[in-house]
């Protein structure tokens, strides 16, 4: 499908954890034209990498129809995993090069599925470096940690 025919959505995501593992949260900002939506959530016992993945997954799953997406994360783990490592993992039956099971394979598989209807361009920015949207996603993720503590 021609990406210019698809609606364009900009997404910023972040994950946070208090202790690793520990209570964690994720946050996402979705922008479509003038419309902006904020998402957040958390889990009582998780890792930072799982929260980074869940932020991207939740944002993509929130899209109701196919879109051209620019997704920005401060997680090299997510960006490298989805743009590079996942191809070999899938080919190797969700095992790493040294034949160990891929960590967080459940979420990588869910992210892979969430991507399917969309054309996604992945962007990385340095976290805590004054990027307004990343700072807001971080705040949402920290609110998610607070929610997780209540569970």
UniProtKB/Swiss-Prot annotation:
One of its GO terms (molecular function) is nucleic acid binding. Residues 5-146 form the RNase H type-1 domain. It is found in: Cytoplasm. Coiled coil: none annotated. It catalyses: Endonucleolytic cleavage to 5'-phosphomonoester. Its main location: cytoplasm. Mg(2+) 1 binds at residues 14, 52, 74. CDD domains: RNase_HI_prokaryote_like (cd09278). The keyword Magnesium applies. Binds 1 Mg(2+) ion per subunit. May bind a second metal ion at a regulatory site, or after substrate binding. Mg(2+) 2 binds at residues 14, 138. Keywords: Cytoplasm, Endonuclease, Hydrolase, Magnesium, Metal-binding, Nuclease. GO terms for biological process: DNA replication, removal of RNA primer. InterPro entries: RNase_H, RNaseH-like_sf, RNaseH_domain, RNaseH_sf, RNaseHI. One of its GO terms (cellular component) is cytoplasm. Its cofactor is Mg(2+). Transmembrane segments: none annotated. Its EC number is 3.1.26.4. The keyword Metal-binding applies. It comes from the Bacteria. Belongs to the RNase H family. Endonuclease that specifically degrades the RNA of RNA-DNA hybrids. HAMAP family: RNase_H. This is Ribonuclease H. The lineage of its organism: Bacteria, Pseudomonadati, Pseudomonadota, Alphaproteobacteria, Hyphomicrobiales.
């Amino acid at each position: 499908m021609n990406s210019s025919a698809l609606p364009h959505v900009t997404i910023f995501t972040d994950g946070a954890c208090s202790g690793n593992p520990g209570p964690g949260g994720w946050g996402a900002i979705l922008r479509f034209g003038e419309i902006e939506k904020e998402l957040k959530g958390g889990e009582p016992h998780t890792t930072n990498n799982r929260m980074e993945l869940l932020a991207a997954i939740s944002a993509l799953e929130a899209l109701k129809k196919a879109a051209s997406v620019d997704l920005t994360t401060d997680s090299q783990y997510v960006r490298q995993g989805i743009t590079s490592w996942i191809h070999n993992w899938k080919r190797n039956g969700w095992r790493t090069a040294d034949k160990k099971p891929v960590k967080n394979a459940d979420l990588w598989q869910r992210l892979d599925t969430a991507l399917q209807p969309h054309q996604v361009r992945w962007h990385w920015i340095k976290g805590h470096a004054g990027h307004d949207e990343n700072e807001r996603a971080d705040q949402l993720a920290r609110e998610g940690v607070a929610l997780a503590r209540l569970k």
